[in-house]
Amino acid sequence: KGDCKGIAISVLNPENQTEMINYAAGSVPLITHDSDAPDSNRLFFLGTENYQAGRELGKLIKKSMPEGGKLMLYVGKIDQLNSIQRRDGLLDELADKPAK
């Protein structure tokens, strides 16, 4: 409480942080940004549609490498929700899978 008027958080691990987010959201307005905790009591999520962003990256890669080739994917934090969603979108696009 105190002088805090609100909280904006980029969630590292929604499964482990949702309880804390819900506790804080009971006292002040709380939003998530960049990486979400969709099952929390946050007011809203502000950020990229991460799965679609991954698909768009896949389209650019296919356009820039029309003959195919080798590709290395680096993900900073593989278990973070936004990373998972972006990676899934990229891999689905590269494999020509239908969008989710």
Residue ranges and their predicted role:
Residues K1-K100:
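A residue-level marker of the well-folded mature domains of exported/periplasmic proteins
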